[in-house]
Regions:
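Non-catalytic, topology-defining segments of multipass membrane proteins
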Residues: 1-93, 127-250, 319-362
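Active-site-flanking alpha-helical
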Residues: 72, 107, 111-112, 279, ...
Length: 362
């Protein structure tokens, strides 16, 4: 099982994973087997407490993120110097990332109890401003939850160590350049068509036909009405408070890459990473969470997204209750808890390349 250094807390440092026995489960246990075992041990009263909604927290966090963005814009407009712009870049960028993580709850319908309100908030206050489509994101992410730890996971390229098993490859991945195209493509009409083709070929080889691009294109643009409207409103807002036209590119578009896409790709890797090659040997161990510092949480994991194992186990739990789930499961040795995203990456970088292991799960 995962080494816990005798403290029975399930907390392990990066790079200290041993493949010995697998949690005492029979046969070739999968990640799904582990998840099922953990869920079965949770009583209904505890689960009911975890699921308790507090909608005011959502409104508070949305207001905080947008209020912070507004203050940063006004600050840049008032001082109009490079220090103000640099500060606004990061304040706006990490506020955008906070919004993006709140949107993750909307994907699971846990942002608001009313599903229509849930999607309305997500489309107009989160996904539209960030150039994203809620339905495409939901389709991809729910498939990730369904297939995590298998070759069918649409996000597997993010978690895999097999294609990052050198210092150069890991560094290139951490720039975002290695995965940007794949991440954009999978929620595009072309990616949707390819996923449909792959699924069809698995069920009935040679029978892929009758699914062109017209339907995916129509769905793609209909989802992004909020994108077009919100970008116009944002441009008007930048100009109305006295910011130059290029500030929209520098203070809104650029941070989406550097403060949203890039940290989220790195976080997604770390939150599923296991120091084993090949990936099939690592798959049963992908219940990973982090307990980062406040600064690291701001950069990589706002709104409790660092409790990623807990989220995968109980995706219906709202983000603001995940710390409670973490406290209740902190002694579960099936969950690997790492302390620092940066610390993990540094230790992993020093260990690369990893040798291929022989495992009954590969």
């Amino acid at each position: 099982m995962l080494s816990s250094h005798g403290d029975n807390t399930g907390r392990v440092e990066a790079g200290e994973i041993e493949v010995v026995d697998f949690y005492g489960l029979p046969g070739e246990a999968t990640l799904g087997d582990v998840e099922q075992k953990i869920r079965a041990a949770i009583d209904k009263e505890r689960l009911r407490a975890w699921l308790q909604p507090h909608p005011w927290r959502v409104y508070r966090d949305l207001a905080f993120r947008w209020g912070t963005i507004g203050l940063a814009m006004f600050g840049a407009a008032h001082w109009q110097n490079w220090v103000a712009y640099l500060l606004a870049f990061f304040v706006i960028g990490f506020s955008q990332y906070g919004l993006f993580i709140l949107g993750h709850d909307a994907i699971h319908y846990t942002l608001h109890l009313n599903r229509k309100v849930n999607d309305l908030l997500a489309r107009w206050l989160i996904y539209g401003p960030l150039f994203m489509g809620l339905d495409d994101g939901r389709r991809n992410h729910l498939n990730h939850h369904r297939w995590v730890g298998t070759t069918n996971d649409p996000d597997r390229y993010l978690h895999s160590l097999a294609d990052k098993n050198s210092r150069l490859k890991l560094f290139f991945f951490c720039t975002g350049l290695a995965t940007f195209g794949k991440t954009v493509l999978k929620v595009s009409p072309f990616g949707k068509r390819q996923q449909h083709k792959t699924a069809t070929e698995k069920l009935a080889p040679g029978n892929f036909k009758g699914y062109g691009l017209s339907q995916p294109l129509t769905e793609y643009f209909s989802q992004r009405i909020s994108v077009f409207v919100m970008q116009i409103l944002l441009i008007v807002s930048f100009l109305a408070i006295g910011l130059p036209w290029w500030s929209y590119l520098v203070l809104w578009i650029a941070p989406i890459y550097f403060c949203v896409f890039l940290p989220d790709e790195v976080r997604a890797f770390c939150d599923h990473a296991v120091d084993l090659v090949p990936d099939t040997a690592a798959d049963p161990y992908r219940l990973v969470s982090f307990t980062p510092s406040w600064l690291e949480a701001t950069v990589f994991s706002p709104h409790n997204i660092n409790y990623h194992a807990e989220h995968h186990l109980f995706p219906a739990v709202p983000y603001y209750n995940l710390n409670q789930v973490h406290q209740d499961l902190r002694h579960n040795s099936h969950i690997t808890v790492k302390r620092s995203y940066v610390g993990y990456l540094v230790q992993l970088f020093a260990k690369l390349p990893l040798p291929t292991v022989c495992s009954s799960y590969s």
